[in-house]
Structure formats: C-alpha cells, structure tokens
Amino acid sequence: AGKARKQLSKNEDTKLKEQYIXD
C-alpha cells in the first residue's frame, strides 16, 4: 500500500487509486 501511495503522487490518481485499494 505504501508503495502505491507513493506512486499516486506521480502517476494518475484514478489509476493508482485502484492499485492502492487493491494492493
């Protein structure tokens, strides 16, 4: 989750949000 959260800062919020939840 921490990894996806960090990417959310640079990647698309919507796309990363799916990964963050999932992760």
UniProtKB/Swiss-Prot annotation:
Superkingdom of origin organism? Eukaryota
Basic and acidic residues: bias regions: 9-23
Location of the region described as Disordered in the Swiss-Prot/TrEMBL record: 1-23
Q: What else is known?
A: On the 2D-gel the determined pI of this unknown protein is: 6.7, its MW is: 34.5 kDa.
Protein name per its UniProtKB record: Unknown protein NF005 from 2D-PAGE
* Organism of origin: Naegleria fowleri (Brain eating amoeba)
